[in-house]
């Protein structure tokens, strides 16, 4: 294969509850993830034996490079790849742009390098890159628990959303570290839709 074009979608957290901080430093959460039609564009091109990233907005320690190198090393792939990344998803807005780019890179390279690996195994690899990267491997609206890797497909009718993107940037890590844990009514995947309708949270 000489070239493969991919679209990496953004996500919305329709509900996000940070449940508690874990002993491993991560946080347990309860959330509802859905994809929206806002995309980064990724192109994979044949390269000799190295991995090269060309990006529209340079990002230090890009997760796309980590994903590509990880897959190459795990499967002892001899071929290289040139990755062109054009960013449209705003950074540090909670839209999962970096995680989506990583997942799309893993999915694309599976096909590009003709690797025999299931979605489930690919999701386990994805988890080493970030807690919400596995969600983008499956690419369906899902209720997420644990770090975000315990996913249950959620029946949710397509809706339209209006996004407001303030100039303020907030890192996910800092936001989670400042979360306060106070008693509140628990929202679950069973009652989310009705609670949303009555604006109870």
PLM region spans:
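ATP-binding N-lobe of GHMP and related small-molecule kinases
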Residues: 1-93, 111, 115-120, 155-156, ...
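Conserved, helical-rich catalytic subdomain that frames metal- and/or nucleotide-binding sites
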Residues: 136-138, 143-201
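DPxDG-like acidic metal-binding loop motif
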Residues: 93-123, 135
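Short, glycine/charged-enriched secondary-structure capping and boundary segments
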Residues: 29-30, 99-100, 177-179
């Amino acid at each position: 294969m000489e070239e493969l074009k991919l679209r990496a979608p953004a996500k919305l957290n329709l509900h996000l509850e940070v449940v508690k901080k874990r002993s491993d430093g991560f946080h347990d959460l309860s959330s509802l993830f859905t994809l929206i039609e806002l995309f980064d564009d990724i192109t994979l091109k044949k390269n000799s034996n190295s991995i090269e990233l060309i990006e529209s907005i340079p990002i230090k320690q890009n997760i796309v490079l980590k994903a590509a190198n990880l897959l190459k090393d795990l499967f002892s792939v001899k071929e290289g790849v040139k990755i062109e990344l054009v960013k449209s998803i705003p950074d540090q807005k909670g839209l999962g742009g970096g995680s989506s780019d990583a997942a799309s890179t893993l999915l694309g390279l599976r096909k590009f390098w003709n690797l025999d690996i299931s979605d489930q195994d690919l999701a386990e690899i994805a988890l080493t890159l970030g807690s919400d990267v596995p969600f983008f491997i499956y690419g369906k609206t899902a209720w997420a628990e644990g770090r975000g890797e315990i996913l249950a497909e959620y029946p949710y009718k397509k809706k339209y959303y209006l996004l407001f993107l303030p100039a303020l940037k907030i890192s996910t890590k800092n936001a989670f570290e400042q979360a306060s844990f106070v008693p509140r009514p628990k929202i679950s995947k069973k009652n989310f839709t009705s609670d949303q309708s009555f604006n109870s949270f």
